[in-house]
Structure formats: structure tokens, C-alpha cells
Amino acid sequence: MKFSVLALAAAASLGLAFTTHRPAPMHPTETAANPGTVYDYTVKTIDGKVVKLSKYKGKKLLIVNTASKCGFTPQYKELEELSKKYAGKVTVLGFPSNSFNQELASNEEVAAFCEKNYGVTFPLFDTAPVKGDDAQPLYKFLADKSKNGAVGEAPNWNFCKYLVDEKGHVVAFYPSKVKPSDPELVAAITK
């Protein structure tokens, strides 16, 4: 009996992470008094250079936690296509992470994998955690509605996406199942 209850609980929690329908993005219903922006953060590129995210002011950003050994890894191809097609509208930023135990061992391996298999040219950053107490500061901000004013959702798997407006404010969260080519996501980028 105890095993059945535990098995049902485990199955239910997995079902929440991998819903079969495409959930709508989370949009803000209330705003923090003074929400921060992603421009307040400095990150390290995949080759170790320090970058202030303020360098992307004036463009929408699609911030994605990525992994090389995931069922969603083929989304790299669509992310690259989106990055090229809407280069004047959005910049895709890829943040490799082993938070779900599906990333390669080093930044060098990740960069080589992305270039060889998907021709990735959009910016990739240092492999770092994206959830929990160990999450890198940017991802703590992205997941905390009291800080960003809009979204209170941490990545529950690889290839979750945060849309950031031209002023650096987080405006939407898209779970892994929402592909970069999803019409709703593309519409949000192009409006």
C-alpha cells in the first residue's frame, strides 16, 4: 500500500514536469513596486569572459537553460533559426546547466557539441546551476517574482525559456515543451 502511494506521488510529480499539452506562458498579474532587470547582472561566457547583460539593452532576450544530453536538445536547431530570423528583434542567450544531470563535463565540450551538431552561433554562457539554492544569481532573479515583478517560475527541466523585454524586464516564462517556433512565442517576440 505504501509503495503504491509513493509510486502514484512520483508519477504525478513527473506528470507535472512533462505535461503533454502546451501550457500558456505565465504573464504578470501584479508587479513588484520596483522590479529589477536582467541588466543588473553580470555573467561569464562559455569561454570565460565576463559580460554585463546591460550590453543587450534595447533588444528582447530569450534566456534558455540548455543541456546537451536531453530529449529537448534538438531545440538548439530552432533556437539558432529563431536567433537568425529575428536577429533585429531578439537575442537568444543559452545557459548550459547540469541541474538535471544531462550536460557534458566541460564548457569546451558543450561549445564544440553545439557548434558541430546545431551550428549554434548565439551566445552561450558558463555551465552553472539554474535551480535551487546553488542557482546562479541571474536564475535566482528570473525565478523570483518578488525581484523581477512578473514571473515566479524556476526551470523544472532543460530548455525552459524566459522572455525579457527591451527594458530588461522579465515578461513571460515558457516551459520546455514550448518549442522556439511556437506561434505564441514568436508572436511575443515580434510584437
Where in the sequence are the language-model features?
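Thiol-/selenol-based redox modules, centered on thioredoxin-like
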Residues: 140, 144-191
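Short, internal strand/loop/helix patches
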Residues: 109-158
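Amphipathic alpha-helical repeat scaffolds
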Residues: 45, 65-69
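Sec-dependent N-terminal signal peptides
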Residues: 4-12
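Thiol-based oxidoreductase modules, predominantly thioredoxin-like and allied folds used
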Residues: 89-107, 121-132
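N-terminal "domain-start" segment that seeds a small globular fold
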Residues: 22-54, 136-137
